[in-house]
């Protein structure tokens, strides 16, 4: 044996994992073909289907545990495709419902969830579709109904109405698959992920949210991934130029955006500040984009979500020499500047000013580096061409000077 073979043959945990990974790299492709073939055969009985589904799920978990990203993404995408939810309308059979349970069940396996990486995207897209279909099945208003623009009906609207009628049948099948509590648990498990794991989870949830905001459908193919440059000083996150409005404003959804609020709320005081800062840079870039949505109601909703999170974040005092508050409040600056230049966007700008005024009144004693972001927005708003916006800004500045000047300039 040569030295390399001898080194590899030494019994150690690392070598065992490496050997398992090599074997799995050879086996997962043929295994995927066999399991997929079994699931595609409509006339197979329940037992072959159950065995194929179990094999596909175990294979996906193994790929994640061995950190084989390509294999994990391929296996998870296969599971997602067999749900029939992540794509155009198809009839949902019992085997498809079982695939939904198996796919979302991957998130309950710690080693699997931690290493899902880019495979979170198909999982979260299917979770979003299940939640939407559950609402349709119960007859409740879906979130897109609250943000639909009023306009004369056109051919596309009639096509959309027909599609919704077709989806009603699929909604009844999806309703029995998972409960609302099990969907909530999927997002609650983000608290158990590592700093790296939760950052990737949040980035993929942002991708789902961006697709929903663009078309109302998380499986539309629209993807929003942050480049590494977004997470560095001087990257897109720190660039305060106006942002392009997101997609078609006619029928956006905000379900994933609300889930982002929930995930941020669950993690804000759980994570060390440095880990939270990395996670927030991903969230902040997306919230700033949502705050520039072409649909003013959606933009206002995104700003209000930021207000809720800011009230909770600012409840904890900032240590000296840190600037976490400034980074946290920066999306308000980006959203305000992105909404400048149009009188039609004045209500959104006015709401941003009102939100910052609320933050000052409620959390002034806790604010440190955040003053820079707050005063920056109020300064821009004081010169706004819309009188209501400029007047609200001057009134907010007046309250800061009258009651909180010692906090703004303690020296």
Question: Which residue ranges define each predicted feature?
Answer:
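Short, intrinsically disordered, charge-balanced linker/junction segments flanking boundaries
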Residues: 381, 392-393, 405-411
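Helix-loop junctions that connect tandem helical modules in alpha-solenoid scaffolds
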Residues: 34-46, 59-65, 81-92, 106, ...
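Core helices of alpha-solenoid repeat scaffolds
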Residues: 12-35, 68-76, 113-124, 179, ...
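Short, charge- and proline-biased low-complexity linear segments
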Residues: 175, 202, 296, 391-394
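HEAT-repeat alpha-solenoid elements in large eukaryotic scaffold proteins
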Residues: 1-15, 30-35, 47-60, 75-82, ...
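Extended amphipathic secondary-structure runs
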Residues: 18-58, 185-224, 228-229, 247-276
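Extended heptad-repeat coiled-coil alpha-helical scaffolds of eukaryotic proteins
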Residues: 32, 299, 361, 368, ...
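Alpha-helical repeat/alpha-solenoid scaffolds of the HEAT/ARM/MIF4G superfamily
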Residues: 1, 15, 107-247
